[in-house]
């Protein structure tokens, strides 16, 4: 490798620029995920080739297949990274809630964190909502699995807030997650993430939707 600093060998083989083989592989993986986020959001999954992703990431095609089995595998890994980030934000926000916090206000604050996780970086929203429907059969299964997990997280939040939860709470939670996703996806068609008024309008819509959905929690 021209210009690389080789520092000798360690447990992971020779070190290049201070990184062993596993660390370099992890770096390539993140570079490919970053490139996929950029290209999938700009031109869509179907119109993006592995060669374009490799060029964007400055990674050789051979190295790509050392990390991912194909474009679909990369796409699913990108969705997983987004889920981990969103989950981290929501978990931190949930942990920060006070014990005497008003349940409705706390839920709205969590929804705001949920929306911000997607609209703070419009690329994340485009990949999640613009490419999230039936890109491939496996991607659709993946999407459904993530939504079920998100609904379970919502149920955990309701329990944490001490809200009365009916036996059909999981169905209500699934409807809430699906609705939140669709509201954000629809807003992205015309909304501008850089305009405070547009983001305030999105939050107001999400708040109203949550008010309607949560009204069904205590019904039998």
Regions found by a protein language model. Name each.
Residues 106, 117-137, 154, 182-189:
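Amphipathic alpha-helical segments used for helix-helix packing
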Residues 31, 39-73, 77:
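Helix-turn-helix
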Residues 68, 73-85, 89, 128, ...:
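Alpha-helical DNA-contacting segments of helix-turn-helix folds
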Residues 24-36, 53, 78-90:
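Generic hydrophobic, amphipathic alpha-helix propensity
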Residues 84-87, 136-161, 170-178, 204, ...:
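Amphipathic alpha-helical packing segments from all-alpha helical-bundle domains
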Residues 90-97, 128-132, 160, 187-191:
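Secondary-structure edge/capping motif, primarily at the C-terminal ends of alpha-helices
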Residues 1-15, 116, 151-159, 174, ...:
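C-terminal peripheral helix-coil segments that are non-catalytic and often amphipathic
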Residues 77, 91-120, 176, 203:
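Hydrophobic alpha-helical connector segments
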């Amino acid at each position: 490798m021209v210009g690389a600093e080789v520092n000798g060998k360690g447990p992971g083989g020779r070190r290049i620029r201070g990184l062993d083989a596993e660390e370099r592989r992890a770096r390539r993986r993140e570079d490919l995920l970053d490139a996929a986020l950029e290209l999938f959001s700009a031109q869509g999954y179907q119109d993006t080739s592995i060669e374009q992703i490799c060029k964007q990431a400055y990674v050789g095609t051979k190295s790509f297949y050392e990390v991912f089995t194909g474009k679909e595998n990369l796409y699913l890994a990108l969705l997983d990274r987004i889920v981990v980030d969103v989950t981290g934000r929501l978990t931190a926000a949930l942990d920060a809630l006070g014990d005497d916090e008003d349940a409705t206000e706390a839920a709205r604050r969590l929804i705001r964190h949920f929306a911000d996780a997607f609209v703070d970086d419009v690329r994340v929203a485009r990949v999640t909502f613009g490419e999230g429907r039936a890109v491939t059969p496996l991607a659709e299964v993946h999407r459904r699995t993530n939504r079920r997990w998100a609904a379970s997280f919502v149920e955990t939040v309701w329990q944490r807030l001490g809200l009365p939860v009916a036996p059909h709470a999981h169905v209500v939670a699934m409807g809430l997650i699906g609705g939140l996703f669709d509201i954000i996806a629809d807003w992205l068609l015309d909304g501008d993430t850089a305009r405070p008024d547009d983001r305030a309008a999105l939050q107001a819509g999400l708040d109203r939707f949550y008010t309607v959905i949560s009204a069904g929690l205590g019904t039998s």
